[in-house]
Amino acid sequence: MELSPRAAELTSLLESRISNFYTNFQVDEIGRVVSVGDGIARVYGLNEIQAGEMVEFASGVKGIALNLENENVGIVVFGSDTAIKEGDLVKRTGSIVDVPAGKAMLGRVVDGLGVPIDGRGALSDHERRRVEVKAPGIIERKSVHEPMQTGLKAVDSLVPIGRGQRELIIGDRQTGKTAIAIDTILNQKQLNSRATSESETLYCVYVAIGQKRSTVAQLVQILSEANALEYSILVAATASDPAPLQFLAPYSGCAMGEYFRDNGMHALIIYDDLSKQAVAYRQMSLLLRRPPGREAFPGDVFYLHSRLLERAAKRSDQTGAGSLTALPVIETQAGDVSAYIPTNVIPITDGQICLETELFYRGIRPAINVGLSVSRVGSAAQLKTMKQVCGSSKLELAQYREVAALAQFGSDLDAATQALLNRGARLTEVPKQPQYAPLPIEKQILVIYAAVNGFCDRMPLDRISQYERAIPNSVKPELLQSFLEKGGLTNERKMEPDTFLKESALAFI
């Protein structure tokens, strides 16, 4: 049958319309909630989802896909799961979890997803970075060689830390772990004020995991009163936040710190503390029905911490020479450093500062056990003058502890042993320091030099702290400045501090 001219015209018109028909519909992959409870949602239908991808529930609550199974997807919920019901729609976002980063973050308090919680409005100009990225490779790294000063005599002299190092702070509750971390942040104030370029400034990121909100508020107040908030970022996943946010917060903080590392700047990140992160991860893993291992932790709990801490590094000159220094904190139970999480984190880090309850109650604060504390790479970054001054003090302290234990049983001691006990008691007194009072490195050198070279030997123990406070204030600024020179202390240079310390000591004997 032949088509009439009118019908042929219509057919060709329809054909051209159909061939030129384009749809611009946005296709969202959606699933439905099969079950929900304890912060975990099982979702059916998200077949193309990626591991670690963000999803959005119908109620507006977000979650992250952690378990990809044949039948369904295990999603951990960021927030309350009370608004999520069985049968609710779940939409893929198509993006892996990312957080804001950049200098706009300085002075702000944010949650585990980088959302401001300090009531100061939205963040200004910033970029976004993925929370989970691969750590720099071997070729991109360089040996640690620049000092990262904490302002604590016990740390900077005996367990020095370098920029790009990972130094673990480990101890029981209430032994001053957070105090060491906060003092380190406060100490950067005067160092940053002296910095002449971006490459000398050290920015700080403090990640609070599972702490009380009141504790975090107190910390914000301390930092703002000391004007230390201007170079710091606070990431807070408090005890009242869901476990997924406590698990994610360290990675979010690390991504913020990596912005500085990758742009040729220097940053310090404090994870306070990783024991609580491991507990949050254990809770999530057990609820996701992953098989438990030792102490009911999942099998990949080592990888949880290793992939986080490996991101702290000193970059090579070709990649910008930036650095990210990490101070992870681990809480022990009754001083047991052989528990699962402590034994996992100790081999990952480049050394540890061990704090003890007994020393704390004896008035030795910071309560650092010098025998157990070690810095594996920090000595390469230590100032030459400091290395010369405190080189023998660690050995003398070890000998003192050994002899002091024996001296309790007998009173007949020869002159050499008596001198060793006398010097050791003074060397134990010198590292004591009040909280929130970091000391510049040149003043530390002067005080330790006085103790190591016997200027305090004839002084009563209770007057040593007065002597320590007096000498840095009465010394010539030129003498203090000479300690910072790269050449170290030569015999000629020693004459001036020797004369000054000898005269100063007379008033305290």
Curated annotation (Swiss-Prot):
Protein's gene: ATPA
Listed InterPro entries: ATP_synth_asu-like_sf, ATP_synth_asu_C, ATP_synth_asu_C_sf, ATP_synth_F1_a_nt-bd_dom, ATP_synth_F1_asu, ATPase_a/bsu_AS, ATPase_F1/V1/A1_a/bsu_N, ATPase_F1/V1/A1_a/bsu_N_sf
Binding site for ATP: 171-178
Keyword Ion transport appears in the UniProt entry: yes
GO cellular component, one term: mitochondrial inner membrane
Coarse class of the protein's main subcellular location: mitochondrion
Protein name per its UniProtKB record: ATP synthase subunit alpha, mitochondrial
Family statement drawn from the similarity comment of this UniProt entry: Belongs to the ATPase alpha/beta chains family.
Gene Ontology molecular function: ADP binding; ATP binding; proton-transporting ATP synthase activity, rotational mechanism
CDD domains found in the cross-reference section: ATP-synt_F1_alpha_C (cd18113), ATP-synt_F1_alpha_N (cd18116), F1-ATPase_alpha_CD (cd01132)
Known role: Mitochondrial membrane ATP synthase (F(1)F(0) ATP synthase or Complex V) produces ATP from ADP in the presence of a proton gradient across the membrane which is generated by electron transport complexes of the respiratory chain. F-type ATPases consist of two structural domains, F(1) - containing the extramembraneous catalytic core, and F(0) - containing the membrane proton channel, linked together by a central stalk and a peripheral stalk. During catalysis, ATP synthesis in the catalytic domain of F(1) is coupled via a rotary mechanism of the central stalk subunits to proton translocation.
Self-association and partners: F-type ATPases have 2 components, CF(1) - the catalytic core - and CF(0) - the membrane proton channel. CF(1) has five subunits: alpha(3), beta(3), gamma(1), delta(1), epsilon(1). CF(0) has three main subunits: a, b and c.
Keywords: ATP synthesis, ATP-binding, CF(1), Hydrogen ion transport, Ion transport, Membrane, Mitochondrion, Mitochondrion inner membrane, Nucleotide-binding, Transport
Protein location: Mitochondrion; Mitochondrion inner membrane
Residues carrying the site annotation Required for activity: 373
